[in-house]
A protein has these predicted regions:
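A glycine-centered beta-loop-beta connector
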Residues: 28-31, 36-52, 102, 110-126
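Short, surface-exposed, polar/charged, turn-prone segments marking secondary-structure boundaries
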Residues: 35, 42-43, 64-67, 74-76, ...
Length: 146
């Protein structure tokens, strides 16, 4: 069985718990990632998604219609809106375990941890789909060779 480590993205974005939502918004505006891991002393303590940010920040923040309360939403800290104690998975876990976690736990990403608890990467449903597509494509090519 294929392990999570083989299909995860080792490239993760991370921030400290006290980073402002304004800073997080700027990060999301400049990268193609949809999740940022929140670390405290190099340990995973939370996850913040672009959807979490959209829910927490006023749609009027940064516009001509902005009011003081709208601007205040950007001064909130990550720890105020992050998902605490996120569900994670080990690097040696198999992909089927990850799929079950996505379905059963209704999460959109799984931080991937080494045995010592340090962050090894991140796994998203897109990573799963790309792995499945590669497997199906390989099987299709092998069928055509027969």
């Amino acid at each position: 069985m294929v392990t999570v480590e083989k299909i995860m993205s080792p490239h993760v974005l991370s921030v400290d718990m006290d980073v402002t939502l304004k800073e997080v918004r700027e990060i999301f505006e400049h990268v193609r990632f949809h999740h940022i891991l929140v670390l405290d002393n190099e340990r995973l303590v939370g996850v913040i998604s672009d959807r979490d940010l959209l829910k927490a920040v006023s749609p009027y923040a940064g516009t001509q219609s902005e009011r003081p309360r709208d601007a205040a939403t950007l001064r909130k800290r990550v720890h105020q809106i992050m998902t605490r104690k996120p569900i994670s998975i080990g690097v040696d876990s198999n992909v089927l375990e990850a799929i079950r976690s996505f379905i059963d736990d209704k999460v959109s990403c799984l931080p991937v941890l080494n045995e010592d608890g340090s962050v090894a990467g991140i796994l998203t449903w897109r990573d799963i789909l790309m792995a499945i597509a590669a497997t199906v494509e390989k099987a299709h090519v092998n069928e055509q060779k027969l």
